[in-house]
């Protein structure tokens, strides 16, 4: 999604399976469109949904949430039909909905494994927000479930699609950097609400 993630998740995903062509007024793009249901309607899910409004290769068509009031708000804001709205108890029924191609899981880290596996078992492609899982074992179980169901699995990460990252890769491949002896990467963010799930080890894992 260009405004927040360079629309990266749609690029390797869409050609493989999307069945609907774009017909947005004023858009020159007439290729396949990925029809996405977002699971998890929190702050980041909202940012994704807002950014998707300008996407050409993906469209928000459904929601999955445990908060009925949020579902109603999103229905009104994004024009989502009732038949494409689910909660965490009944979203397995999404397998019978031909209008949804994929589910973007944007929930606390500790919930990813179980939710992605259920998405796969429902026959829908899965986009999972980073980090994919709490550990490698969980991640492998998710991969295995998607392979078994013959659906795609993509982690919602964007840096390998960014211009600066691609340039560094090019420089390395063309030996412009010489012999690399040391690399250090640093990243930080404000903790914010001390009661948030990101500070809960069971939900966030390593954070």
Can you say where each PLM-predicted feature lies in the sequence?
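Predominantly a Rossmann-like dinucleotide-binding segment in NAD(P)-dependent oxidoreductases
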Residues: 43, 159-207
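Rossmann-fold dehydrogenase core element
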Residues: 141-158, 177-185
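Glycine-centered tight turns that cap/initiate beta-strands
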Residues: 57, 84, 99, 176-179
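Rossmann-like NAD(P)(H) cofactor-binding subdomain of soluble oxidoreductases
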Residues: 111, 131, 155-161
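Structured beta-strand/loop patches that form or line metal/cofactor-binding pockets in enzymes
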Residues: 3-28, 32
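Short, Asp-centered acidic motifs that coordinate Mg2+ and/or phosphate
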Residues: 62, 102, 182
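Beta-loop-alpha module in the N-terminal Rossmann-like domain of NAD(P)-dependent dehydrogenases
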Residues: 84-145
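N-terminal Rossmann-like dinucleotide-binding module
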Residues: 22-80
């Amino acid at each position: 999604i260009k405004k927040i993630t360079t629309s990266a998740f749609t690029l390797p995903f869409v050609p493989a399976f999307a069945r609907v062509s774009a017909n947005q007024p004023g858009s020159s793009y007439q290729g396949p469109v990925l029809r996405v249901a977002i699971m998890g309607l929190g702050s980041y899910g909202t940012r994704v949904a807002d950014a998707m409004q300008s996407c050409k290769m993906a469209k928000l068509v459904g929601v999955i949430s445990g908060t009925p009031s949020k579902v109603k708000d999103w229905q009104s804001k994004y024009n989502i039909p009732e038949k494409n709205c689910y909660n965490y108890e009944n979203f397995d029924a999404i397998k019978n909905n031909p209008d949804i191609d994929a589910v973007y899981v944007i929930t606390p880290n500790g919930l990813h494994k179980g939710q992605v596996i259920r998405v796969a078992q429902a026959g829908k492609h899965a986009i999972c927000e980073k980090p994919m899982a709490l550990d490698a074992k969980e991640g492998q179980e998710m991969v295995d479930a998607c392979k078994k169901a013959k659906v795609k699995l993509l982690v919602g990460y964007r840096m390998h699609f960014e211009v600066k990252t691609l340039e560094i890769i090019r420089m390395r491949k063309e030996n412009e950097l010489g012999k690399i002896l040391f690399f250090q990467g640093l990243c930080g963010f404000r903790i914010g609400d001390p009661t948030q799930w990101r500070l809960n080890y069971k939900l966030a894992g390593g954070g």
